[in-house]
A protein has these predicted regions:
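Radical SAM enzyme [4Fe-4S]-AdoMet core and its adjacent flexible, acidic
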Residues: 1-114, 118, 122, 126-127
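Flexible mid-to-C-terminal extensions adjoining Fe-S/redox cofactors in radical SAM and related proteins
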Residues: 116-117, 121-188
Length: 188
């Protein structure tokens, strides 16, 4: 089960898990909670903000402890790596990874129906078109390279955890217009 968490429904997370697992006794291997990425008219009403993102992290931790024997609670929040940094660094060493956290342009890309390639399904910035360019050319695009090398600005640029977190590039772009800007909802 996957659910997007916004400021509108953050207080319903626990009830959702309780209803599915405890009340309906449905066996769910993974319960995924995705952070809402503000865009367009929902920028004001759905955004979590710093306090909301911290609240989301705390709720995820609480749910993980409560349901540890019944389901796995996961999230795509890059900041979570900071709280498990020892384990994350061990994984990075084991698999020879330069960075983890936000996967935009690093662990994945998005190819839209018209061939437009973006660093992430939620980061609506074109880095090329697969119908006109090779994938290698697109992956060597300036934006893709800066994201991959974590050449970020603001708080994320100076953060000692940028290689294990990197903030959410889609959120940075949606709220500032710059995919390399700091994640404005970071609570660290």
């Amino acid at each position: 089960i996957s659910s997007v968490v916004s400021s509108i429904n953050i207080d319903e997370m626990e009830e959702l898990v309780h209803q599915v697992i405890d009340e309906e006794h449905i066996k769910v291997q993974i319960f995924g909670f995705k952070r809402f990425v503000p865009s367009n008219e929902l920028k004001e009403t759905g955004a979590l903000g710093k306090e909301g993102l911290e609240k989301l992290y705390n709720k995820l931790e609480k749910l993980n402890k409560k349901y540890v024997d019944k389901t796995k609670i996961v999230s795509d929040m890059p900041m979570k790596n900071i709280f498990q940094k020892k384990r994350v660094y061990e994984i990075m060493d084991k698999y020879n990874l330069d960075c983890v956290g936000c996967s935009a342009g690093i662990n994945g890309i998005s190819i839209r129906n018209d061939g437009t390639v973006t660093p992430c399904t939620l980061l609506y910035i074109s880095c090329g078109n697969i119908l006109n360019e090779s994938l290698e050319e697109i992956l060597n695009n300036d934006i893709m390279q800066k994201i991959k090398k974590r050449e970020l600005s603001g708080k994320c640029g100076g953060c000692k955890y940028k290689m294990i977190c990197g903030g959410c590039r889609a959120c940075a772009y949606q709220l500032s217009g710059n995919p390399l800007a700091e994640d404005p909802e970071c609570f660290i």
